[in-house]
Design a protein with these regions (language model features):
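Residues in the recognition helix of alpha-helical DNA-binding motifs
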Residues: 11, 25, 36, 65
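DNA major-groove recognition helix of helix-turn-helix/homeodomain DNA-binding modules
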Residues: 27, 46-61
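A short, Lys/Arg-rich alpha-helix, primarily the initiator
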Residues: 1-14
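Short alpha-helical DNA-recognition segment
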Residues: 17-35
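Alpha-helical residues within the helix-turn-helix
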Residues: 13, 24, 53
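Residues that mark the N-terminal boundary/hinge immediately upstream of a DNA-recognition element
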Residues: 7, 18, 44-47, 58
Length: 66
């Protein structure tokens, strides 16, 4: 089962966007987003849903429950 941080990084690279671009979309600074990709932090529910919408995937997929 793939972990959330790995899935998030994989999706970002597939879409060809930077961490900064996604952070701006979420309305946060780049560092907190980097913490999501490094596994140091998890987004709150609202940000998780926003990420799923951004990448056009389900929250289950993001969380590695595919």
């Amino acid at each position: 089962m793939i972990k959330f941080d790995e899935r998030l990084k994989e999706l970002r690279k597939e879409k060809g966007v930077t961490q900064r671009e996604i952070a701006e979309f979420l309305g946060i600074k780049t560092r907190p987003y980097q913490n999501y990709e490094s596994g140091d932090r998890r987004p709150d529910y609202e940000k998780l849903v926003a990420l799923a919408d951004y990448f056009d995937v389900t929250t289950d997929y993001l969380l590695g429950r595919d």
